[in-house]
Amino acid sequence: MDLKQELQEFAQRVLGGEPELKRKAEAGFRLIYIPHENNGYGGGHNVALKEAQKLGSVYHLVVNPDVWFGPEVMPALIEYMDAHEEVGQIMPKVLYPNGQIQRLAKMLPTPLDFFGRFCLPEFLIRRRNKKFELVQSGFSKKMNIPFLSGCFMFFRMSALNEVGLFDEQFFLYAEDIDMTRRMHQKYETLFFPSTTIYHTFTRGSRRSLRLMWIHIISTIKYLNKWGWWNDSERKEINENVKAQIGGAL
């Protein structure tokens, strides 16, 4: 099978077959294939983001292939973003397939938050993780959060043009923390529980030594960029997060 046939099969499988393809084509929908070397998660998405910049897109969604959601999600997010220009990035409530909440809206991590997960038994860091992962918030209200998961990042393109695209020094992991943090410096980065998506969330770096090593390298690069223990901005931002949810952390 040649590339053209593969793309046609992919489009039909993902977009719903010939009738749906025809309907979307008539509505101006386009599927664009851009061949490019593998520059990592952020680098790959930057290829699409640069195309979105050329097209003058208003919004852009970065989403993992193991995420799915209903047709009501995107209209709700767009409607909210249209009405709130202070929001540069938004993420819905994320659930496991069984309906359990995924704690993917977090404070900015310290070195202990990063490496404790790799090196320490879970029971030793359980209490700290609950604070870091904002369990006390209940995930029931909108929150302006500095670390939103890369599984679903809905951007306002004008904001993204201002803060810059993904930092490609992060091949995989930590690019979402870095991106949300940069966006958070200038815009609200919103956890939006009024809409819900589902995410399989396989935690690859906990099952693969190679992925774990990549995760550690990205963590070191992130801390080298923003600061290890001497990161006053992190402390200030995290204190603001605590204040949002009542200072109960």
For the regions a protein language model found, what residue spans apply to each?
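Short beta-strand-to-loop acidic/aromatic patch adjacent to the donor-nucleotide binding site
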Residues: 57-68
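Acidic metal-phosphate-binding loop of nucleotide-sugar-dependent transferases
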Residues: 39, 66-68, 170
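Short, flexible, basic/aromatic active-site loop/helix in glycosyltransferases
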Residues: 109-145
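Glycine-rich, basic loop-to-helix element that forms the pyrophosphate-binding segment
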Residues: 36-55
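Short glycine- and hydrophobic/aromatic-rich loop-to-beta-strand nucleating segment
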Residues: 129-136, 146-155, 159, 177
